[in-house]
Amino acid sequence: MYYVYILYCQKDGKLYIGFTSDLKKRILKHKSGFVLATKHRRPIRLIYYEGYLHEDDARQREKYLKGGKGHSELKIQLAHILDKLGYKYANTRY
């Protein structure tokens, strides 16, 4: 199984979108500071993930979500969660 996941980085209030084949292990690495992209943005919180049978499907979805249209749709889909977290919508790429 392959996963696309979204983290909320509490320090800067931004999102991180990633891909992995082992979700539990990857989240532990993020939380422990072993991932450079989120090391200085901790604490982090897993707010969403999707599972895929094929690696290519997961990678395509990750790429789409990181793009403008996909990211906009993501914000709409997760609006209730993001509002509770105090996510700043204006002028944010992630």
Q: Where do the PLM segments sit?
A:
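GIY-YIG nuclease catalytic motif and its immediate N-terminal context
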Residues: M1-V35, R42, Y49-L53, D57-K63, ...
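Short arginine-rich
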Residues: K63-I76
